[in-house]
């Protein structure tokens, strides 16, 4: 909860992503200490998803810093109009970070919370509150950076940046196309079903 609350008040884009990272590691700890199949499997998926999504968010921060020479959220706005390619990638990674269903962040967070509820209901309720805070600060950041009125007009992502960012969405959006069982929804269903039957 501490990481989420500190992220809520960050004016710096890089610090917000860093504190959101701390907050997401709480789901790993929660899943491990739940010590059941859902919790442990959820912790593994959160670690994998976190590595992909957070590195992509730091890449997005680097792109915007390269153009504006600042990381203050208040200095950006209107990037969906001025930098549509960048804003698309930032939106995808923001939604994956907050755990939107269908993206890589959802399965791990859901399993960690499910494992926590099985071990201790109070821990599950607290984890659910962290999900709400996470959605709050990530959506606030995306709204300010992408849709708020812009003070300047930085150019859109150039070819090398766009190609680098274009490789990241595939695993974030599920990974099942490459036979990746870690984030495959069928594996999630099987683990949950086996645990429910025991």
Residue ranges and their predicted role:
Residues 83-86, 140-198:
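Cytoplasmic/organellar membrane-interface segments at the starts of transmembrane helices
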């Amino acid at each position: 909860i501490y990481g989420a609350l500190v992220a809520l008040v960050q004016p710096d884009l890089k610090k917000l992503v860093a504190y959101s990272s701390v907050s997401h590691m709480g789901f790993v700890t929660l899943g491990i200490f739940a010590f059941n199949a859902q919790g442990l499997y959820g912790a593994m998926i959160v670690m994998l998803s976190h590595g992909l999504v957070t590195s992509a968010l730091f890449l997005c921060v680097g792109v915007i810093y390269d153009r504006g020479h600042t990381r203050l959220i208040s200095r950006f706005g209107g990037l969906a109009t001025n930098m549509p390619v960048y804003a698309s990638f930032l939106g995808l990674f923001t939604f994956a970070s907050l755990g939107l269903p269908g993206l890589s962040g959802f399965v791990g967070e859901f399993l960690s919370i499910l494992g926590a509820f099985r071990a201790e209901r109070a821990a599950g309720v607290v984890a659910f509150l962290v999900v709400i805070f996470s959605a709050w600060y990530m959506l606030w950041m995306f709204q300010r950076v992408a849709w708020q009125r812009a003070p300047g007009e930085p150019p859109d992502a150039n070819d090398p940046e766009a190609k680098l960012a274009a490789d990241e969405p595939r695993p974030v959006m599920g990974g099942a196309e490459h036979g990746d069982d870690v984030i495959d929804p069928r594996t999630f269903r099987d683990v949950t079903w086996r645990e429910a039957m025991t």
